């Protein structure tokens, strides 16, 4: 299956989880083996010189772990606060109404690691920005950011470009 056909499997659910939201449901894409492979192969094509693949909880894990498997690379889970059992570092980021925190194990990456960072959605850039900060604090270099979906009209891309002008950001779908 080609990438364009795979992306057509994403369905929009209007007014979910609340009125005015157009939720992008990726479960039909995930359920189709050929489509899922097409997406992970496309993501893997951006790996270049990466030594690790990092994924952001929760749906970023799905794609990042599959890409890591395909490339025979390590996978780094970046999780919400309180979900990792060992020593962690954390990074908080702003939300529309409040804040949230991401964590990663202190020994998850080695200094000098080259990280391909994957998430499912790029919206405001807050979550991805926090993940980049975590990688930088551990001495890793984020070589590329990938998102399956980018929400048009939100400042995510501009926010990331302003703060991290040397990190390319690629989204497969902008809606």
Predicted segments — roles?
Residues 1-175:
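PRPP-associated nucleotide enzymes
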């Amino acid at each position: 299956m080609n990438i364009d056909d795979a992306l057509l499997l994403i369905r929009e659910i209007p007014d979910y989880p609340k009125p005015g939201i157009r939720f992008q449901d990726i479960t039909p894409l995930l359920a189709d083996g050929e489509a899922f492979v097409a997406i992970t192969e496309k993501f893997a094509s951006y790996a270049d010189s990466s030594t690790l693949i990092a994924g952001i909880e929760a749906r970023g894990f799905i794609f990042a772990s599959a890409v890591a498997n395909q490339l025979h690379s390590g996978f780094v889970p970046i999780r919400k606060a309180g979900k990792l059992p060992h020593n962690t570092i954390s990074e908080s980021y702003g939300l529309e109404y409040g804040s949230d925190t991401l964590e990663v194990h202190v020994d998850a990456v080695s200094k000098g690691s080259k990280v391909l960072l994957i998430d499912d959605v790029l919206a405001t850039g807050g979550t991805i920005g926090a993940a980049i900060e975590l990688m930088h604090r551990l001495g890793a270099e984020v070589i590329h950011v990938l998102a399956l979906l980018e929400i048009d009209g939100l400042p995510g891309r501009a926010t990331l470009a302003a703060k991290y002008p040397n990190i390319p950001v690629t989204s497969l779908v902008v809606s």
